[in-house]
UniProtKB/Swiss-Prot annotation:
Main subcellular location: cytoplasm
One Gene Ontology cellular component: cytoplasm
Domain of life: Bacteria
Chain positions with O-(phosphoribosyl dephospho-coenzyme A)serine modification: S28
Native source species: Xanthomonas euvesicatoria pv. vesicatoria (strain 85-10)
Chain's role: Subunit of malonate decarboxylase, it is an acyl carrier protein to which acetyl and malonyl thioester residues are bound via a 2'-(5''-phosphoribosyl)-3'-dephospho-CoA prosthetic group and turn over during the catalytic mechanism.
NCBIfam families per UniProt: malonate_delta (TIGR03130)
Name of this protein: Malonate decarboxylase acyl carrier protein
């Protein structure tokens, strides 16, 4: 297992909604995403626990894209991954954010 950690400067808070959201499942080719509202001095932190070692550059690209579209403040995202593709990662991140902000995923 490999643990990756990223931190992004946030620009806006997540819309009103839940304190946390959990989407996905930990299974082959999938992942679980937990998003929590926590005081992080305006930052968004993302921690990934993955079975697929050596893909840090790909994770960085996917998360850079997500952070550019959603520059959230005071949000922690925890990802448990079992080999999900970048498209699945992006989908689950979007779903988790929708649930956190009160929309149906």
């Amino acid at each position: 297992m490999e643990t990756l950690r990223y931190r992004f400067d946030g620009q806006r808070g997540a819309r009103a909604g839940l304190e946390h959201a959990l989407v996905g499942v930990v299974a082959s080719g999938n992942l679980e995403v937990l998003v929590e509202r926590v005081p992080l001095e305006g930052a968004m932190e993302i921690e990934i626990l993955t079975a697929a070692r050596g893909f840090g550059a790909i994770w960085q690209a996917v998360l850079d894209d997500f952070a550019a579209r959603h520059p959230l403040r005071d949000v922690r995202i925890s990802i448990n991954d079992v080999g999900a593709t970048p498209a699945v990662v992006s989908l689950r991140l979007e779903q988790a954010l929708e649930v956190l902000q009160g929309a149906d995923a």
